Amino acid sequence: MNSNNREEQKVSAAKFYGVGVGPGDPKLITLRAVEVLQEIEVIAIPKSKMERESIAWEIAKTHCPSGVRIMELEMPMTSDESILRAAWQSAADKIQDEMQKGNSVAFLTLGDPSLYSTYSYLLTILEPVLSPEQIETIPGITAMAAAAARVNWPLATGDEPLVILPGIEGLEEYEKYPNLVLMKVSRNLPEVLKRTQTTGAQAILATRVGQAGENIRVLDAQEELEKVDYLSLVLLKQK
């Protein structure tokens, strides 16, 4: 086999992994995720300028070989879609460059890669240029599942629906459903409290699930909280 054929085989064998590392507790990472991390050449870590350390990397690093290469990918904290698209494209280009060299890349994500993750946007860019065999999405335990488990809270039972909202927009429309999960509630907690007072719903506030500073507790509709940590969610169950 000549050197060109060997190089082509190396490139075609390179894989792109979306690795869900769970909510924060290193014990809640899956065996498949550990297998991949132990063999990977490049770890891709999404970070905003505001972040000093990546929580996902803190979870994953104990499972990675000492010589693994870290590729930090800047993801701006903005709602400007043109800026976000440029950042996603830049990240996808860097990942593809590594794969062209024959290196497999693992993109880390808190929780599960398929739920409100930057990985999904990179996937839409890379799927058309990679073969199906070169992509593997490794599921992870979500913060909402871990929070519910911590307090023995059934997310849904029987034929009940479960509604997941990325914020509180349109909350009134969904209050007819028995089970709700509200993500990204940090700045909207006063409105959530107001709605629980109106509807009498049971609520659990979960902050930094599985991480240092974890706080999971029943939310008292009468208390006054203006803002909580960015990594917070609310589980709601209508009475």
Walk through the language-model features, giving the residues of each.
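A contiguous loop/helix-start segment that scaffolds small-molecule binding in enzyme catalytic cores
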Residues: 16, 174-239
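Class I SAM-dependent methyltransferase SAM-binding "motif I" and its flanking Rossmann-like core
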Residues: 115-176, 225
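Glycine-rich, flexible N-terminal cofactor/catalytic loop recognition
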Residues: 6-75, 194, 204, 212-213, ...
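Glycine/small-residue-rich loop that forms an oxyanion/phosphate-binding "nest" at active or ligand-binding sites
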Residues: 71-100, 107
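A polyampholytic, Gly/Pro-enriched intrinsically disordered region
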Residues: 90-98, 154-166, 223-233
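Conserved Motif II region of HX4D acyltransferases
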Residues: 98-120
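Gly/Ser/Thr-rich loops at beta-strand to alpha-helix junctions
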Residues: 25, 50-51, 111-118, 141-143, ...
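General beta-strand structural signal in soluble alpha/beta enzymes
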Residues: 45, 72, 107-109, 135-140, ...
